[in-house]
Amino acid sequence: MKRIDELYRWLLRPPTDGPAATLLLRLMAGGVFLSEGILKFVYANQGVGRFTKLGFPWPAATATFVGGLEIAGGLLLLAGLCTRLIAVPFVIEMIVAILTTKVALYLGTSPLPLPPAPPKVGFWAVMHETRSDWAQLLTVGFLLLAGPGRWSLDARLSASAKRGR
């Protein structure tokens, strides 16, 4: 039970005294996840169509779930609320994205359209195509470890809770 309490505190009561520049990373990651989530609903080829081509089970449900997660989670990151908690599914999502799309690209077996600029397959194609995946993965990894920073709703709520004691 003690470990569960520690995990709860670590996820939902993160340190809020980190560098102010954490705000920039939160805004970048939150903005990218939010816009990518919206795109999954606006453009079928980015949502259901993409998950269908990749062979995901229940592509409509998967696209709806992932798109909804990205919209809600992106808004949470932008606000700096539950930052560590939402970073966990985002880390998992980005690892799955890299494994399901970029390994096949490397091997030249991707069901998705090839990148518009050479090279089309192999190491350098993967390096080009994974740039945003890596940026998102490393950003939410940072936020998972560092917390939301002092300019966040988590910091305001933490300060309010301390004043209320």
Where are these regions (language model features)?
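Extended, low-polarity transmembrane helix blocks
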Residues: M1-V42, A60-G68, A72-R165
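Short juxtamembrane and helix-loop transition motifs at transmembrane-helix boundaries
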Residues: N45-P57
